[in-house]
Swiss-Prot record:
GO terms for biological process: L-histidine biosynthetic process. Homodimer. The modification N6-(pyridoxal phosphate)lysine is found at residue 211. PROSITE patterns: AA_TRANSFER_CLASS_2 (PS00599). GO terms for molecular function: histidinol-phosphate transaminase activity; pyridoxal phosphate binding. This is Histidinol-phosphate aminotransferase 1. It comes from Trichormus variabilis (strain ATCC 29413 / PCC 7937) (Anabaena variabilis). Keywords: Amino-acid biosynthesis, Aminotransferase, Histidine biosynthesis, Pyridoxal phosphate, Transferase. It comes from the Bacteria. Its EC number is 2.6.1.9. It catalyses: L-histidinol phosphate + 2-oxoglutarate = 3-(imidazol-4-yl)-2-oxopropyl phosphate + L-glutamate. Pathway: Amino-acid biosynthesis; L-histidine biosynthesis; L-histidine from 5-phospho-alpha-D-ribose 1-diphosphate: step 7/9. The keyword Amino-acid biosynthesis applies.
Amino acid sequence: MTNYFRSNVEAMASYVPGEQPPRGTQVIKLNSNENPYPPSPAALAALQDIDGEWLRRYPEPLGGEFREAASKVLGVPSDWLIVGNGSDEILSIVIRACTEPGRKVVYPMPTYVLYRTLTQMQAADILEIPYQENNVLPVAELIAADGAVTFIASPNSPSGHIVPNDDLRKLASELSGVLVIDEAYVDFAEESALDLVQEYENVILIRTLSKGYSLAGLRLGFGVGNPKLLDGLFKVKDSYNIDAIACKVAAVAITDQAYKNSCVAKVKASRTQLTKDLKQLGFHVWDSHGNFLLTKPPEGNAEYLYEKLKEQKILIRYFQQPGLEDKLRITVGTDEQNHILVRALRDLLR
């Protein structure tokens, strides 16, 4: 067969997202870390207000309306923001702008596996450094590696732990390359590294509206960084990467902080209760600062439980990766969804 693809693409494995059942399928979906509550009513109203004139014209290329709204919420100038088709696109833009064969991308493991996929697309070198015991960041090893790009997810997935800002500040001050702090789950955490962006030119902070704002289907994320760093990223950004609908709705959603905070508070309360319930079943549950829990079943039968729950139309996440084979990641759902999950697990463990 004709070989159409670059050798690095032939060799790489595709990123595998959580299963997305067809719309209308009756399932308890706790596998993709989606927010169980609907988007802001104000955002939904903005969606209804969009008319054909918005769709006839090309969108504003830099997502200006969203940048202005996010600027006011975050307290940073709008020219410190780059907007993307989900935060994954911002990650991709960084990789495209900063790496090539012979340049190294570094990150601790386990973490978001898309970092590996994006790096392989560019045929850049990869160095994966294991987390130390109790999810302690291997700061010295990351500094010694000095990648062209270093990814740190905080809160991390699938573990849910947060990386101390002191560790991130140490990395930012010592690394010569770009430090990407992926804060996709920060809305459910107690602290952020946002201040580091204004202290260090080599830091870009990545956020999304998929989690805290319930807009995973809309696809909008953004990066916060020094304009000197963003200038290089804009060079490789697609010309019209943010559609007009996403920009408009996301601008309204990020402005409605009261609604977002109310949903986040409910998720955090449910996270606490679900942690307690799973521990009563004998699970080990790691402390989480995200909208999910990393758990270890009492009998080490993670894959079995994953498959049996799937038969009952309850979807959670099982990773066939080193160090995760005996663990399950569970998205925090509504209290009702969590009760159904716990009841099913209790029956399976009898």
